[in-house]
C-alpha cells in the first residue's frame, strides 16, 4: 500500500501544478487496503481537503489504484487530522524517486506485479485509457487538472470515472525533470547580480497556453542579504528616482493559473527588455497583480543595472506632469527625460481617456522609446480596443506588442495568497480558515487582504483564536453583500442580453450552437461567481443533470485558456456582473 502511494504521488506530481499538488495531494495518506473487498482508504487532514479531493481527484486516484492492483478498486476518503504527518514521509520518498511516472509505477509494483497494459509506451503529452485505449490529451490545468469531455465508453472497467462518472484518462505532464527540480540554466543580463532569470530567448510566450507556462520552472531573484548602509542609501535614492516599490518583486508574487501567462511574459521582458513583446500590455480587474508585476520587472532591471533609466508612473500622474510642463514652460526638458528612458512603466492607461494633449505627447514619447529599443509596459482595466476616448493611433500601438489578461485568482491561489499575507504579518491562520475565506471571496487580492485584516482585528479585539466561527462573525457584513451580489438569474439575463438570445433559451432543451454556447458560458459563470452547487445550477437551467453542468464548466474553462476572443467575452461579462 505504501509502495502504491509513493508511486501514485510521483505520478500525480507530474500531472498537477506544484500548487495543486502541494495543496491537495501531499497532505493525503493511505490508511488501509482491504484485499478481499479491493477497497482502499485514504485519509485527509481536514474537512475542506476531504470534500475537495473527493469531488475533484477521486476518479484519477481510483484509476491509478486500478492500474496498480490490476482490478477494480474502490477508493474511500476518511477524515484524520493526523494524516498530514504520515503523508509527508510517503510523498517525500516519491519525490526522491526521480523516475518517469510509468517507471515509478512499475518499480512500486515489485516483482509480483507488472505495469498495467495501458501504461505501456506513454509519452509526453499523450493520454491513454485502460488496455491502451487512446483518448484525447488532458489539459493539466483545468479545474483540478483533469479533462473536460463528457462520459464516454472505451472499455474502461467500472470505477475509472471522476466525480461525474466520466472517463478519466491518464494525463502525462509536459513538465521535464528540470521543471520539477533542477534549476534551469540562467541567462545573465548586463550586471553583476548572482541571481538571474531563466533564458527565455527561444520561448514564444504568445504561443504558450497557460498549462505550458505553468509547467516551466523559472528561477527568479531570491531575497538579497542586507546591504551596507551606504549601498542601502544609494538603493533608496535609485528607487525614489524611478518611483519603484522595492517590495514588489517576482519572489513574492503568488502565481496561479489566473496569472501564470502574464508572469511568463513579464519574465521574458525582464530577460530581454526592448526586444521581446514591446510594448507589453497587461489588463485585468482591480487588485489582480498588474501593478505588482510591472514593479517586479523594474526592480529586476534595477538590480541587474542600477544605472538603468527607469520610470514607473500612474497615468493620472503623467497627465499632471504634462500640465506642469506647460505651466512652467519646461516641455523640452519633459520630452528629453521621457524620451531617454530605458524602461517606462505606465499604470492604468485608461485614465488618458479624453485627454487629447496628453495622448499626443505620450504618442511621441512612445514612438521615441520604441525607436531607441527601450521597453514600454502598460496596464489597464480592459482590452485595448475597449478603451473609450483613446486615439486610434495609440490603440494600434498597444496592439502591436503582446496583450495578456490577468484573471481573478482560482481557489488554490487565493488560499496561497492568504497564507502568505498572514505569514508576512507573523500570524498563524489555520488552513481551514484560509479555505473558508477563499471559497467565499473570489474577486481580487485586495479584497482578500482586507478580509484578512478584518479577521485579525476582530480576533485581537475580542481576544479569540482565529476559527471558522470567528471568521464568519468578523466577515458577516462582507459575506452578506457577496451572497446577494450575483445570482444565477442575473447571470442568465446578462448572458442572454450579451449574446442576443432569449432568457427562456437558458432553460430550454434547444441545442443550436447560438443557444447552447451562451448557455454553457452562463453555467460556467454561475459556478465561478456564485456559491451554488452543480446540482443547484443544473436545476436553475431547466432541470439539467449536474454532469451536464460539469461538462459545460470544464469545456469553457479549457477553451478560455486557448481562445483569446472567448477570454475577452468572459472578462466583459464578469466585469458587467460585478459592477
Curated annotation (Swiss-Prot):
SUPFAM superfamilies: P-loop containing nucleoside triphosphate hydrolases, TrpR-like. Gene3D superfamilies: 1.10.1750.10, 1.10.8.60, 3.30.300.180, P-loop containing nucleotide triphosphate hydrolases (3.40.50.300). Residues 460-579 are annotated as: Domain IV, binds dsDNA. GO terms for cellular component: cytoplasm; plasma membrane. It holds the Pfam family Bac_DnaA. Residues 171-183 have a biased composition (Low complexity). Residues 71-242 are annotated as: Domain II. It is found in: Cytoplasm. Keywords: ATP-binding, Cytoplasm, DNA replication, DNA-binding, Lipid-binding, Nucleotide-binding. GO terms for biological process: DNA replication initiation; regulation of DNA replication. GO terms for molecular function: ATP binding; ATP hydrolysis activity; DNA replication origin binding; lipid binding. Oligomerizes as a right-handed, spiral filament on DNA at oriC. Plays an essential role in the initiation and regulation of chromosomal replication. ATP-DnaA binds to the origin of replication (oriC) to initiate formation of the DNA replication initiation complex once per cell cycle. Binds the DnaA box (a 9 base pair repeat at the origin) and separates the double-stranded (ds)DNA. Forms a right-handed helical filament on oriC DNA; dsDNA binds to the exterior of the filament while single-stranded (ss)DNA is stabiized in the filament's interior. Domain I is involved in oligomerization and binding regulators, domain II is flexibile and of varying length in different bacteria, domain III forms the AAA+ region, while domain IV binds dsDNA. Belongs to the DnaA family. This is Chromosomal replication initiator protein DnaA. It comes from Cupriavidus metallidurans (strain ATCC 43123 / DSM 2839 / NBRC 102507 / CH34).
Amino acid at each position: 500500500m505504501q509502495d502504491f502511494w509513493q508511486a501514485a504521488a510521483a505520478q500525480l506530481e507530474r500531472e498537477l501544478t506544484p500548487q495543486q499538488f502541494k495543496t491537495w495531494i501531499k497532505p493525503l495518506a493511505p490508511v488501509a487496503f482491504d484485499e478481499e473487498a479491493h477497497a482502499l482508504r485514504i485519509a485527509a487532514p481536514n474537512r475542506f481537503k476531504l470534500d475537495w479531493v473527493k469531488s475533484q481527484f477521486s476518479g484519477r486516484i481510483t484509476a491509478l489504484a486500478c492500474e496498480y492492483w490490476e482490478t477494480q478498486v474502490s477508493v474511500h476518503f476518511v477524515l484524520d487530522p493526523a494524516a498530514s504527518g504520515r503523508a509527508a514521509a510517503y510523498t517525500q520518498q516519491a519525490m526522491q524517486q526521480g523516475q518517469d511516472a510509468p517507471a515509478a509505477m512499475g518499480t512500486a509494483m515489485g516483482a509480483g506485479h507488472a505495469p498495467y497494459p495501458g501504461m505501456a509506451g506513454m509519452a509526453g503529452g499523450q493520454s491513454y485509457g485502460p488496455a491502451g485505449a487512446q483518448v484525447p490529451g488532458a489539459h493539466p490545468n483545468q479545474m483540478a487538472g483533469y479533462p473536460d469531455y463528457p462520459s464516454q465508453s472505451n472499455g474502461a472497467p467500472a470505477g475509472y470515472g471522476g466525480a461525474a462518472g466520466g472517463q478519466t484518462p491518464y494525463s502525462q505532464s509536459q513538465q521535464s525533470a528540470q521543471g520539477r527540480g533542477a534549476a534551469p540554466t540562467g541567462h545573465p543580463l548586463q550586471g553583476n547580480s548572482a541571481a538571474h532569470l531563466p533564458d527565455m530567448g527561444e520561448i514564444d510566450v504568445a504561443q504558450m497556453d497557460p498549462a505550458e507556462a505553468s509547467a516551466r520552472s523559472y528561477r527568479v531573484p531570491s531575497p538579497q542579504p542586507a546591504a551596507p548602509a551606504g549601498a542601502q542609501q544609494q538603493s533608496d535614492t535609485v528607487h525614489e528616482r524611478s518611483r519603484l516599490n522595492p517590495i514588489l518583486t517576482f519572489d513574492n508574487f503568488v502565481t496561479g493559473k489566473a496569472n501564470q501567462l502574464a508572469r511568463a511574459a513579464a519574465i521574458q521582458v525582464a530577460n530581454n527588455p526592448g526586444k521581446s513583446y514591446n510594448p507589453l500590455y497587461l489588463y485585468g480587474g482591480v487588485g489582480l497583480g498588474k501593478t505588482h508585476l510591472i514593479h517586479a520587472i523594474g526592480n529586476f532591471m534595477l538590480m541587474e543595472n542600477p544605472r538603468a533609466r527607469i520610470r514607473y508612473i500612474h497615468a493620472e500622474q503623467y497627465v499632471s506632469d504634462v500640465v506642469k510642463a506647460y505651466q512652467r514652460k519646461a516641455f523640452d526638458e519633459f520630452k528629453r527625460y521621457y524620451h531617454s528612458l530605458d524602461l517606462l512603466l505606465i499604470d492604468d492607461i485608461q485614465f488618458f481617456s479624453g485627454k487629447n494633449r496628453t495622448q499626443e505627447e505620450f504618442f511621441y514619447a512612445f514612438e521615441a522609446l520604441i525607436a531607441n529599443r527601450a521597453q514600454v509596459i502598460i496596464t489597464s482595466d480592459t482590452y485595448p480596443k475597449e478603451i473609450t476616448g483613446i486615439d486610434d493611433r495609440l490603440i494600434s500601438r498597444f496592439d502591436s506588442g503582446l496583450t495578456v489578461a490577468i484573471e481573478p485568482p482560482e481557489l488554490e491561489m487565493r488560499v496561497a495568497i492568504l497564507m502568505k499575507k498572514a505569514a508576512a504579518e507573523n500570524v498563524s491562520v489555520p488552513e481551514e480558515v484560509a479555505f473558508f475565506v477563499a471559497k467565499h471571496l473570489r474577486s481580487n487580492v485586495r479584497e482578500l487582504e482586507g478580509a484578512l485584516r478584518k479577521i485579525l482585528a476582530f480576533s485581537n479585539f475580542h481576544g479569540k483564536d482565529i476559527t471558522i466561527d470567528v471568521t464568519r462573525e468578523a466577515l458577516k457584513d462582507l459575506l452578506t453583500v457577496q451572497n446577494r451580489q450575483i445570482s444565477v438569474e442575473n447571470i442568465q439575463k446578462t448572458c442572454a442580453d450579451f449574446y442576443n438570445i432569449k432568457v427562456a433559451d437558458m432553460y430550454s432543451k434547444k441545442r443550436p450552437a447560438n443557444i447552447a454556447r451562451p448557455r454553457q458560458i452562463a453555467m460556467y459563470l454561475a459556478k465561478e461567481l456564485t456559491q451554488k452547487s452543480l446540482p443547484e445550477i443544473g436545476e436553475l437551467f431547466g432541470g439539467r443533470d449536474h454532469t451536464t453542468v460539469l461538462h459545460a464548466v470544464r469545456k469553457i474553462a479549457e477553451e478560455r485558456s486557448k481562445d483569446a476572443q472567448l477570454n475577452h467575452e468572459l472578462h466583459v461579462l464578469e466585469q458587467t456582473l460585478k459592477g
